[in-house]
Amino acid sequence: MNTKVPIYSINGEKRGEIDLPEIFNYSVREDLIRKAFRAISLSLRQPYGSSPLAGLRRVGHTTKPGLGISRMPRIAGGSRVVGIASAVGGKSAHSPRSTKKLYVGINEKERKMAKFSAIAMTASADAVRKRGHRFSESLPLPVVVEDAVSGIKKTKDAVNLLKSIGLYEDILRSKEGKHIRAGRGKMRNRRYKVPKSLLIVGTDSVSLKVFKSLPGVDVASMDSLSIRKLAPGGVGGRLTVYTESAIEKLREANA
């Protein structure tokens, strides 16, 4: 891993160098990254369940023995069976319940180790390329830009910055990889899937929102940085751009 990386200005030119914090030398635990991603993803599920009265809204009377028919609850004056699992429109035997525990926990130490591992993998060129990202061969990772990029208001300026640094190729990869989703999701306002490209990390994600209009780009503040953004799908090594302030905040992290 590089101990020093260049700082790029708002014009994409090298403005100086910065010492990387020790967190980028953290011992990577890919198993914990997968575990943390799974726990977070499963905990975001929406509770669902059937009504407790489903299949029980008809009054059925059980017949006495000796009538030559099975003793199942039937509608009065008729032969239709109601209220049991084997009947048409009857109660489901084991229906889903909204009270089911969906939250999946993870140890606090493991969660921190997973986050530190994912951050460390953003500085590994091999891990980033293995994940499928495309960038300039001579570009040292992680990419650090000056805080002035938070003042960019036009997408055109953001594109010019990424082109001059050597990161725009990954945006094109995401744009070309956009495809129609398989399955029912295409009918439910999730028609397209777009591959993940850059992650822009700063101290304030609102000021970096101009980058969100680019295909596959996510922005995050240091407070909102999570495994879901650092390692989509539980696979670390996302191509990440940090601001100077974000690097200084990482320096304070207790790795």
Curated annotation (Swiss-Prot):
The keyword Ribonucleoprotein applies. Keywords: Ribonucleoprotein, Ribosomal protein, RNA-binding, rRNA-binding. Pfam families: Ribosomal_L4. It comes from the Archaea. InterPro entries: Ribosomal_uL4, Ribosomal_uL4_dom_sf, Ribosomal_uL4_euk/arc_CS, Ribosomal_uL4_euk/arch, Ribosomall_uL4-arc. The keyword RNA-binding applies. One of its GO terms (biological process) is translation. GO terms for molecular function: rRNA binding; structural constituent of ribosome. GO terms for cellular component: ribonucleoprotein complex; ribosome. Belongs to the universal ribosomal protein uL4 family. Part of the 50S ribosomal subunit. One of the primary rRNA binding proteins, this protein initially binds near the 5'-end of the 23S rRNA. It is important during the early stages of 50S assembly. It makes multiple contacts with different domains of the 23S rRNA in the assembled 50S subunit and ribosome. Forms part of the polypeptide exit tunnel. This is Large ribosomal subunit protein uL4.
